[in-house]
């Protein structure tokens, strides 16, 4: 059985780095290792065919918030592929990315989407069917820490949105619901892959709140005889976003800028969208989405803009110091 590494990793798209090679560092969030391992090989082959140049792509993975902080603090990322727009905005506010980054690529620079589902043990012994089951006594929940993990922030907001919709948009009742949920959380890892390892490898918890792609990967990689996915009645549309880190690539040369831009644009190509779908992300391309229609369950999806007024407001209200997460975390 494959062990999934946790923390900061560097994956090379080539076994050797030659002086004439173009080097690219993609700083990404936690559960995209498999996606970009495949995508980097495809893009390198595409770029070689188009230009004759070799591109060597390195990867860094971790909780999205921590990764954004690393870029702010000086890690020389050429591109970022993070869990949510707020983390890219945080880098832009420090002047390392153009503030209009979100408009540079289609679909608000989110080339694929996902949502939040539950992974349970085979047979679903605790009978987890929807969000309300996560607050029952005796249910052990695994989710990452929203302070460091982008996926955890999506998890949190998905639960909050569900609670609002089932309590006439009463914010106080939604806060009580999410507080009850977090009282059942047994382990708060720093990132989504760490939480998957806690649930899958260490055998802790009854239910993992997870990215849909991570849950599908776990069942396909580790066997459907061990785990099963529960799709809730509604969840949030999760939109991971991408950007060139302007201040880094512009220090190099025009070729570095061109490669970084092409690297992200190719995510929208038919091949890029196929790779995303094969790695259990919901593709944007209509033709590719139709091909993989049966792979992704239908459910009611709400957006962060609809329910929370966008990421800036959600971050301030829920995840900033003194926000609702801090309030409900007080034991």
Where are these regions (language model features)?
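Bacterial N-terminal signal peptides that target proteins for export
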Residues: 1-8
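Ligand-binding pocket segment of bilobal, Venus flytrap-like solute-binding proteins
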Residues: 166-233
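Sec-exported extracytoplasmic/periplasmic mature domains
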Residues: 40-49, 72-76, 85, 92-96, ...
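N-terminal signal peptide c-region/cleavage motif recognized by signal peptidases
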Residues: 14-16
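Extracellular/periplasmic juxtamembrane helices and adjacent flexible linkers that interface
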Residues: 249-331
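Short beta-strand->loop
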Residues: 27-29, 120-122, 140-167, 184-185, ...
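N-terminal segment of the mature folded domain
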Residues: 20-149, 293
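Short helix-loop capping/hinge motifs at secondary-structure junctions, enriched
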Residues: 123-129, 148, 161-169, 248-258
């Amino acid at each position: 059985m494959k062990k999934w590494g946790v923390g900061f990793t560097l994956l090379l798209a080539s076994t050797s780095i030659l002086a004439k090679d173009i080097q690219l560092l993609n700083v990404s969030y936690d559960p995209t290792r498999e996606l970009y391992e495949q995508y980097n090989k495809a893009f390198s082959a595409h770029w070689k065919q188009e230009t004759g140049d070799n591109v060597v792509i390195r990867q860094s993975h971790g909780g999205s918030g921590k990764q954004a902080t690393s870029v702010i603090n000086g890690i020389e990322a050429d591109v970022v592929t993070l869990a949510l727009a707020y983390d890219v905005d945080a880098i832009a506010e420090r002047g390392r990315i153009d503030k209009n980054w979100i408009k540079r690529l289609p679909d608000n620079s989110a080339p694929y989407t996902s949502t939040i589902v539950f992974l349970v043990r085979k047979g679903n012994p605790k009978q987890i069917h929807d969000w309300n089951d996560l607050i029952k006594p005796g249910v052990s929940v695994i989710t990452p820490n929203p302070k460091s993990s982008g996926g955890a922030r999506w998890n949190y907001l998905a639960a909050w949105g569900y609670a609002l919709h089932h309590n006439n948009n009463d914010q106080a009742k939604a806060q009580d619901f999410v507080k009850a949920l977090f009282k059942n959380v047994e382990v708060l890892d720093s990132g989504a892959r760490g939480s998957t390892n806690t649930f899958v490898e260490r055998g802790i918890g009854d239910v993992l709140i997870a990215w849909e792609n991570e849950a599908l990967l776990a069942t396909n990689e580790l066997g459907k005889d061990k785990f099963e996915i529960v799709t809730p009645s509604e969840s949030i549309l999760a939109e991971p976003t991408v950007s060139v880190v302007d201040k880094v690539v512009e220090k190099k040369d025009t070729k570095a800028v061109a490669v970084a831009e092409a690297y992200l644009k190719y995510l929208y190509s038919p091949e890029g969208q196929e790779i995303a779908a094969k790695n259990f992300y919901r593709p944007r391309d209509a033709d590719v989405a139709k091909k993989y229609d049966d792979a992704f369950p239908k459910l009611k999806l709400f957006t962060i803009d609809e329910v929370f007024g966008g990421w800036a407001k959600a971050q301030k209200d829920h995840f900033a110091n003194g926000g609702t997460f801090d309030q409900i975390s007080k034991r």
